[in-house]
């Protein structure tokens, strides 16, 4: 998701890039660090896809909806706003997320934060991700869809990056509540306004 779907290093041939899938779970950080070492100096194309399990999406959504923490989701009613940057580059993704509807017509969405360990431009980058129920769920497809709606601003991300990783190492995830805006004639550009719903990390 986000830059993780892109190629990390320039290709020397026109061959299709190798795709690695990494599950976003308690072993995710170790796996990503191993990939970082593996990719160092590698000339061939390699793309990384992050798979967010339905069970985790369910846990986060349930914690948000019920206002109750769980073993993996340290929920609280803190509702601390965080800056979201990069939305202007994700307008098509945000439009798809809203199903071409106005952002204000969307319900509040659940979401989470994901540090981007392999980001070649900013090692402290933290992605902001929203969770929705798949529009056409089938037995062979996932119940939930995850979409990246932006990034934390650099200064804020640098302060909490390591703390988020420490939580992930304990198989705990930072829950978000996200309000969508835009998608109208008066305000065509979509926006996503995230609020952190945990007191395990200080974001203020």
Please tell me what each predicted stretch does:
Residues 2-204:
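Conserved active-site motif detector
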